[in-house]
């Protein structure tokens, strides 16, 4: 699993991982991603000397291409059999965070026999234990029920409130780091990588007070006078508020 913050190059990491697996194991490889990021993958792949083709079903595959992109719906709806691929990576894999979702349950079954599986998404919150366990279940690292029993004590007063056993805390984080990479900033890779240009400067906030005349708040349909101007919910109301506050 690749858990990396925004802008750290998750797409490049996935492409290079699949390229190396393809060079060693052969076959065809696949990235499953939202439609909005497929051009980003194509651009980054070109930088690495790899050509990706976007497909929605197996019939669109060509003999001269081994690297493919598809969207989540094509796999979830059964249009594309992922078992024909040597390796598959799920970009924006946060769609798997909910155990009860159709996507998670479907993917858990159809990916069981895919030899090399990867997930890539932004770094989950450290206390989102169930989300981390769901990724482990999908990747075939450990069954979700087994992980819950092994590492956590339940709270009988509150559902889904998990607490790490104190004597299992170190073991849990070591286990997690045996299959997942966490990156919050470039310097997490070592002192040779600077955070300059990545760490944002402190946010400067300028407050502007706009005087409002509540005498023109108007009336309700029943004639009741409004105490305050109402929220600008519609286009005409928003335009009126803009004119009055410019």
For each of these PLM feature ranges, what is it?
Residues 58-87, 98:
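Conserved helix/coil segment N-terminal to the catalytic DExD/H
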Residues 7, 73, 93-97, 124:
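Catalytic acidic motif of RecA-like/P-loop NTPases
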Residues 1-4:
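Conserved pre-motif I regulatory segment
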Residues 187-246:
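Conserved helicase/translocase motor-coupling segment
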Residues 6-18, 25-49, 126-132:
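Conserved Walker A/P-loop ATP-binding site and its immediately adjacent core
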Residues 36-59, 139-143:
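Conserved helix-turn-beta segment of the N-terminal RecA-like "Helicase ATP-binding" lobe
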Residues 27-28, 47, 87, 95, ...:
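Conserved P-loop NTPase motor "coupling/switch" region that bridges the ATPase
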